[in-house]
Amino acid sequence: MWKYSNKIIYRNVSGNQLWFNRNSSVGGTLSQQTQLELADSRIDEKWQQARSFGEIPGPSLLRMLSFFMPGGALRNTNLIQMNRLMREMYGDIYCIPGMMGKPNAVFTYNPDDFEMTYRNEGVWPIRIGLESLNYYRKIHRPDVFKGVGGLASDQGQEWADIRNKVNPVLMKVQNVRQNLPQLDQISKEFIDKLETQRNPETHTLTTDFHNQLKMWAFESISFVALNTRMGLLSDNPDPNADRLAKHMRDFFNYSFQFDVQPSIWTFYKTAGFKKFLKTYDNITDITSNYIETAMRGFGKNDDGKTKCVLEQLLEHNKKVAVTMVMDMLMAGIDTTSSACLTILYHLARNPSKQEKLRRELLRILPTTKDSLTDQNTKNMPYLRACIKEGLRITSITPGNFRITPKDLVLSGYQVPRGTGVLMGVLELSNDDKYFAQSSEFIPERWLKSDLAPDIQACPAARTRNPFVYLPFGFGPRTCIGKRIAELEIETLLVRLLRSYKVSWLPETPIEYESTIILSPCGDIRFKLEPVGDLM
């Protein structure tokens, strides 16, 4: 269960303790950490005037459980639907009681609460999520991970030590953009493969487009992480890569089952949890083999090649390097492919916006044989606006989560330290209060200036509050893969929409299923009509 004192915060998970010691330091000095007083709170006048924690609206434990029973209000809903229904029932702030060892969780849809939470998260933000992953790495397989849980599951100084090592490699723009030539080549190969699978008469694909996107994403992230080509876009793909993609689908489903939904696995290892451990064993074995193979090739005939993430991190710490690259291979498939598919869907449903974007792309690439460079990709304002707008309407995560390290007042209620806070960003991104005509795909709302007579900036159509739109999170725990994902998405969309006019074929909107992310599912079919070169 969760415990909190004035010295430590931890959760005991079958002998595994996540420590947040006030006497430790992170990315700075002890005095800096002490000044923030992660485990202390100041009882001020605002706190004394606030309503009590017990007055926050919300269901009882039994009521909450009934929602997921057959016939319950939240039965068979995805995370988008669940947030919307609960907000309709309880308003812009409500509390879900803790269960199965998890803390109470306050859900808020107030951007002022978002800012309050982020501004008080300290230098060691506490984001509990993948506890099953932490158990696997630190308790089940310490032989492989040597005490390193990774950025997704470690907390406190352990998390900070890892983050400080990987930030210069993964968050520095120029360090990431040096991968552009190869990522462009991978995207061109993806287009070539689509062409072999496209019916020339109906312009439809004969294969699963979403699965093909996953193969592109895997090929891209494996190059960035390992400087390795898997051959997934060729006629002879690596069979282990296909196996890994399948195991990753299972992993995302299991993580949702054991880390998001109520589960007894922390008290009793169920048959389903043992299947999860086996799935993760398979993932670990495959990724370990890829890493070992890549390491054997380092230093041989480099000829000035760009160092991949693994090679750069090995210069600092082998344990961190291996774990970080495993995380990249795991997280870089479904997340990036789902985001790409979502943005493409919105552009396919809005042909006039797509045509405006294509004019920009034709300027960048007059012919499909031209290459993407740092120079010609500097000025792509409409593409980047389209990406922002697509992720505004449908972010692959509905919100951001933190454990409060100090007492806070949110929406006029006392929220004691140690409470979980879920900030429902996606709900606000689809609220007319913050985005005019929020259900409409309007990239122009993100432009700073007019681009053409028919592409005029309308920043008034979006809120000026910076805490409403946060697809990659905020603060020290901003998504570590943000720079890589942005580059991959931009490169793929440039190539795809420069080559084809894309239309959405199903009569119904795209559907999403909940794993630990929102993933497109159901009937996913596009029409791809070739676009010629400029004469």
UniProtKB/Swiss-Prot annotation:
Its EC number is 1.14.-.-. It comes from Drosophila melanogaster (Fruit fly). The keyword rRNA-binding does not apply. It comes from the Eukaryota. GO terms for cellular component: mitochondrial membrane. The gene is Cyp12b2. Heme binds at residue 479. PANTHER family: CYTOCHROME P450. This is Probable cytochrome P450 12b2, mitochondrial.
